[in-house]
């Protein structure tokens, strides 16, 4: 093979590659096959690189001719590949738009409305009833310290509620509140009597999960501080609330004990032929008022608390508290 024949062969190879590559690029029907073709043509081990590797057989004066021709072909092929890629992308987009096109004349598919959770509706109903009695809504943090959760409420250090088996303790003297009573303390710190508040919220206790207990549940507490309040005002408020919520169910008060109220009582309603405890209440202990700088000789008050889950279960005839937390649509769709 002469040097001139080598030059002619390389030139013919470039021309043949140009025609064949242009045809193959046009026939590529997807981006993957186009990318594979690009590698075959222009990759490090592609056909153009192999032709350029044969330039060693040429004279020094002939190599620039083949080099220029090869670079021109490379640029042409890159342009053809880019144009084809853009065409394929546009085709994909057009197909996607066509597949997602909405027929505005088609009848709509109905979307079922969701339901408010029974715990939420029960909480709102309870709060609304007390707001109707002149109470204002107050809320507080779920992470509390020992003072607000225990000490300010006259709960002694040896009280069982402070035990680790009953309370979720965190670091730095913090804990997950075991009741919403700390909201009462925070309110009295910032508001002078008279006050009437209702405090809904989530609370935490280390209870084993069963049909009537959960480590996370919801409470609503009420507090009234004013001049001349006594147990008859407490009883009248509780009775008015229970009648508005349950109707004419029988109600009874039983003497009880809470560290922050004196006297204290538990309230039962008759449900399904049995007495069911639904509230705890009592007159605010004077020592609690004194600790907050409130004169117990002038001011008196009462507090009451209830578990939202129990009210919800009685109201809707639910026999297991766990049903309220399972997110079972078959259950929730009943409300």
UniProtKB/Swiss-Prot annotation:
Residues annotated for Mg(2+) binding in this entry: 262
Catalytic activity line of the entry: tRNA(Phe) + L-phenylalanine + ATP = L-phenylalanyl-tRNA(Phe) + AMP + diphosphate + H(+)
Cofactor comment text: Binds 2 magnesium ions per tetramer.
UniProt entry tagged with the keyword ATP-binding: yes
Gene3D superfamilies for this protein: Bira Bifunctional Protein, Domain 2
GO MF terms, alphabetically ordered: ATP binding; magnesium ion binding; phenylalanine-tRNA ligase activity; tRNA binding
Compartments, record wording: Cytoplasm
Single GO biological process annotation from the record: phenylalanyl-tRNA aminoacylation
Essential cofactor(s): Mg(2+)
EC number(s) on file: 6.1.1.20
Main location class: cytoplasm
Class in the EC hierarchy, top level: ligase
Annotated Gene Ontology cellular component terms: cytoplasm
Keywords for the protein's UniProt record, in alphabetical order: Aminoacyl-tRNA synthetase, ATP-binding, Cytoplasm, Ligase, Magnesium, Metal-binding, Nucleotide-binding, Protein biosynthesis
Subunit structure: Tetramer of two alpha and two beta subunits.
Family: Belongs to the class-II aminoacyl-tRNA synthetase family. Phe-tRNA synthetase alpha subunit type 1 subfamily.
Annotated protein name in UniProt: Phenylalanine--tRNA ligase alpha subunit
Organismal lineage: Bacteria, Bacillati, Cyanobacteriota, Cyanophyceae, Synechococcales
This protein's encoding gene: pheS
